[in-house]
Curated annotation (Swiss-Prot):
Reaction(s) the record says it catalyses: [[Fe-S] cluster scaffold protein carrying a second [4Fe-4S](2+) cluster] + N(6)-octanoyl-L-lysyl-[protein] + 2 oxidized [2Fe-2S]-[ferredoxin] + 2 S-adenosyl-L-methionine + 4 H(+) = [[Fe-S] cluster scaffold protein] + N(6)-[(R)-dihydrolipoyl]-L-lysyl-[protein] + 4 Fe(3+) + 2 hydrogen sulfide + 2 5'-deoxyadenosine + 2 L-methionine + 2 reduced [2Fe-2S]-[ferredoxin]
Remaining remarks: This protein may be expected to contain an N-terminal transit peptide but none has been predicted.
Pathway the protein contributes to: Protein modification; protein lipoylation via endogenous pathway; protein N(6)-(lipoyl)lysine from octanoyl-[acyl-carrier-protein]: step 2/2
Subcellular location: Mitochondrion
GO terms under cellular component: mitochondrion
UniProt binding sites for [4Fe-4S] cluster 2: C120, C124, C127
UniProt keyword annotation of Manganese present: no
Residue ranges of every copy of the Radical SAM core domain listed in the record: 105-324
Protein family: Belongs to the radical SAM superfamily. Lipoyl synthase family.
Biological source species: Brugia malayi (Filarial nematode worm)
Enzyme nomenclature, EC number: 2.8.1.8
Name the record gives this protein: Lipoyl synthase, mitochondrial
Binding locations of [4Fe-4S] cluster 1: C89, C94, C100, S335
Length: 357
């Protein structure tokens, strides 16, 4: 295990440096400044200074507008609208929407379906999804309609996510579980990842999801402990998120657990490392890092642009700590398709191992 000690605000390591495979030592990584090097290399300001309104977008985050001529993208967008399905790709203004919906190199298109409507009962300060204390009631036909729609798309891995529904007794866990069950009936071989809320810490709701037949249980930590009250809704706590991830693994040992962290909100390297250790202690398998990007002027400002080089270093740290899979990059999101094929192999291998035993 890679260890570190705290001395006020400085990060120091023991004389025994732990080297990452084929890369710099963890000490070198921490000591290397992300901002100073990047300012010189890219010629832009990397950290938000006092009284500054916002940071200019760095070159590696500039993406093209989805092309209306892209057949797959246009077809999927029309289907989603016709079936009145909500996707986190659209609601959260994901920068990867064209890549995931279009498909490439014989890779099927991927969409992350957002269940239980497009209105959340929580108001996290980084998220652009609509909020309300009393969202519209659930559509009882949504589970079967969603399953049929996904079956028609012909994909082999799907991510189901949802808004928070604190207005419902079980937080909507039974609704999500019903969707998974219908999906497995329509497509027995499809792999299902559920990116779910914390259900206010309800372990019975966690059990409902974990026993639904899903393959990957995902719940996002979003940020480090210190920033959680500032970044997330007050009802979402750091320890509560750890609790649901830990219980999902205890309830179903074969399940793949997954979480995601946004960088650029003002966290320190030491705080990120502490979070990674917390996640490994409870057996989380997969991890993604992505750059926080302010969706509108009403949301939190970006405090720092993290360079692609720094994201690559975090990937190496994640791998060295023992995560089965670490996806790390400025535009990586928790449901980004890049890791789905790897996770699919992990799920299949675990299922095969369970059957053999």
């Amino acid at each position: 295990m890679i260890s570190f000690t705290t001395r006020i605000s400085r990060v120091t390591f023991s004389s025994k440096r732990v080297a990452l495979p084929d890369g710099p030592s963890l000490h070198d990584f921490i000591e290397t400044g992300n901002s100073n090097d990047a300012v010189e290399k890219y010629g832009i300001q990397m950290k938000l200074e006092a009284n500054a309104k916002r940071l200019r977008l760095p070159p590696w985050l500039k993406r093209s507008i989805p092309s209306v001529d892209n057949t797959n993208f246009t077809h999927l967008k029309k289907q989603v609208k016709k079936l009145k399905l909500a996707t986190v790709c659209e609601e959260a203004r994901c920068p990867n929407i064209e890549e995931c919906w279009s498909g490439s190199n014989n890779v099927p298109s991927t969409a992350t379906i957002m269940l239980m409507g497009d209105t959340c009962t929580r108001g996290c300060k980084f998220c652009s999804v609509k909020t309300s204390l009393k969202p519209p009631p659930l559509n009882p036909e949504e589970p079967i309609n969603t399953a049929k729609a996904i079956a028609d798309w012909g994909i082999n891995y799907v991510v189901l996510t949802s808004v928070d529904r604190d207005d419902i007794e079980d937080g909507g866990a039974s609704h999500i579980a019903a969707t998974v069950k219908h999906l497995k009936q329509e497509c027995p071989n499809i792999l299902v990842e559920c990116l779910v809320p914390d259900f206010r810490g309800s372990l019975s709701s966690v059990e409902t999801i974990a026993s639904s037949g899903l393959d990957v249980y995902a719940h996002n930590m979003e940020t480090v402990r210190r920033l959680t009250p500032w970044v997330r809704d007050p009802r979402a706590t750091y320890d509560q998120s750890l609790k649901v991830l830990e219980y999902a693994k205890k309830f179903r040992a074969d399940i793949v657990t997954k979480t995601s962290l946004m960088l650029g909100l003002g966290e320190t390297d030491e705080e990120v490392l502490t979070t990674l250790h917390d996640l490994r202690k409870i057996g989380v398998d997969a991890l993604t890092f992505g750059q926080y990007m302010q969706p509108t002027k009403r949301h939190l400002l970006v405090k720092e642009w993290i360079t692609p080089e720094k994201f690559e270093e975090w990937r190496e740290v994640g791998d060295x700590l023992g995560f089965l899979y670490t996806a790390s990059g400025p535009l990586v999101r928790s449901s980004y398709k890049a890791g789905e094929y790897f996770l699919g192999k992990v799920v299949k291998n675990r299922k095969q191992g369970v059957q053999e035993n």
